[in-house]
């Protein structure tokens, strides 16, 4: 057969070299070990000590690079609920209820979820509070679902009133168009009450009476502007 002439395109020359195939790019992948899952790179390194996004999901990795299962505390002190499928978000139950942000970080203090106010108690590890809870010196009431009570009465032996902010009322307070009086413990008073050198009468419902009041054969006049 005819030999190709020098310079023939069929024969590789320095001016027309055959390009080698480029090497496959280094990739990272999930690798399962006895200790759990780790996200490893081809160069022998892996993710560790934090929360990172992999494939559109956020995962926690401990100091050895493994995905923990359960509560994980990041180096900055933030808590996450870690699973093999990524960190949890939203409401999470582990004995008590906890609230996790969109990034998975546990939140504490007053939080609004679904239009309802909740208190995640930092003194209880972030657990959702229920019942009577004192925050910065003020008493609040959270129902069994954790929702803060506001502008409503709560009965716990005595009657207590929670204002619009959720704070328990003490002293004189107005609910609707009616005046009431609660002692220092927040318990609604009834009957005669002395305050500031004046006497006031509170009916069985706790409402302050005004005008003429008859008790047995005795009549008393309670000023409409102040009781």
Label every PLM stretch briefly.
Residues 1-227:
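Extracellular adhesion/carbohydrate-binding repeat motifs centered on closely spaced tryptophans
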